[in-house]
């Protein structure tokens, strides 16, 4: 990754390591989540162009692991070569391949969320009712390994939700979750607000 961009480069290193634990079925649920978070911490802090200010960093804040936010749902693939114009925090747009739509039931509410194809993984950016209160105001994202999608089924673990780099450093340009991915309930899972950066 290089400064002022979000969709490129070294971020794949973090994805690869953390997703190893996120999809491991051999570890107990809580241990798997805790290991994944620790690997995320170690990798983002060791990045050559880390968005974290190492002089002031203390720790990341997370909700406690909650298996009720590990959700299996329906997946509808998009048409071949279909793209979506994703708005960025600097008012620019980024054309990104649209992988499809995930239909999930969360706390009794059915939501249909757009899922994007980043090459190595799928990307699910979202907003929810915790924004600017318990979590970063600009929304969060989940990276989903492609093997978590099986034909018309998808597994989404909101415990793996992380802040966009803009939550750590205003010098980064990040995607804004599309309006279709606004979830009308609180997702008390994944990463919480970082420091005082509640708004994008």
Model region roles, listed by residue range:
Residues 6-22:
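Hydrophobic membrane-insertion alpha-helices, especially the h-region
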Residues 54-93:
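Extracytoplasmic/periplasmic/luminal assembly and interaction segments
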Residues 75, 117-119, 126-130, 158-162, ...:
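A mature extracytoplasmic/lumenal domain signature
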Residues 79-140:
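Mid-length scaffold segments of soluble, non-membrane domains
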Residues 169-200:
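C-terminal partner/receptor-binding element of secreted or periplasmic proteins
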């Amino acid at each position: 990754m290089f400064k002022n961009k979000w969709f490129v480069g070294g971020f794949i290193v973090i994805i690869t390591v953390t997703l190893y634990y996120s999809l491991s079925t051999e570890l107990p649920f809580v241990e798997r989540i805790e290991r994944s978070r620790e690997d995320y911490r170690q990798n983002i802090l060791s990045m050559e162009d880390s968005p974290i200010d190492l002089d002031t960093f203390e720790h990341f804040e997370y909700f406690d692991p909650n298996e009720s936010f590990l959700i299996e749902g329906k997946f509808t693939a998009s048409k071949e070569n279909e793209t979506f114009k994703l708005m960025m925090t600097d008012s620019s747009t980024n054309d990104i391949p649209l992988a499809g739509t995930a239909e999930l039931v969360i706390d009794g509410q059915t939501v249909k969320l757009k899922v994007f194809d980043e090459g190595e993984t799928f990307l699910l950016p979202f907003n929810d009712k915790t924004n600017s209160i318990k979590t970063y105001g600009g929304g969060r994202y989940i990276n989903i390994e492609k093997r978590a999608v099986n034909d018309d089924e998808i597994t989404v673990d909101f415990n793996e939700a992380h802040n966009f780099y803009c939550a750590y450093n205003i010098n980064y340009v990040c995607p804004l979750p599309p309006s279709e991915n606004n979830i009308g309930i609180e997702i008390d899972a994944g990463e919480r607000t970082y420091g005082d950066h509640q708004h994008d």
